[in-house]
Amino acid sequence: KLLFKYASLIKPNVTLLFYNYIIKKNFLDKFKFVFNLHYTLLPKFKGLDGFEKSLKSKHSEIGCTLHIAEEKFDEGKIIIQKKIKNLSKESLNIKKQKIFLLGIRILKLFFSDLDYYLKKTENLKN
């Protein structure tokens, strides 16, 4: 409720979410561009425990995904996705750091060409 109230006051053009809460339909309807940065490769590792599952998995790649936020958890169309090798010799902390750095790279890319990604989003929504 607080997020909705605050966002309604500032009326953002782009809303970027980083947390694991289900977004209500009224929030998604009110704002045109709502994105979620998910610290796993979607659609492989959805949900609240997706991050830990991906880090502990035997999959050859792990990564980070920026997607359109939808009412259904982690179901939105993918806007940007970056991958790295999942090296079994690396500790979980090293893997976490690498994933967070991928998230930063994704956000830099997204905001460096925002018009392109907003047009891409409009096309994916239609």
Regions found by a protein language model. Name each.
Residues 12, 16-125:
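Donor/substrate-binding cores of folate-linked one-carbon enzymes
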Residues 2-10:
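Short amphipathic alpha-helix with an adjacent loop that forms part of the alpha/beta core around
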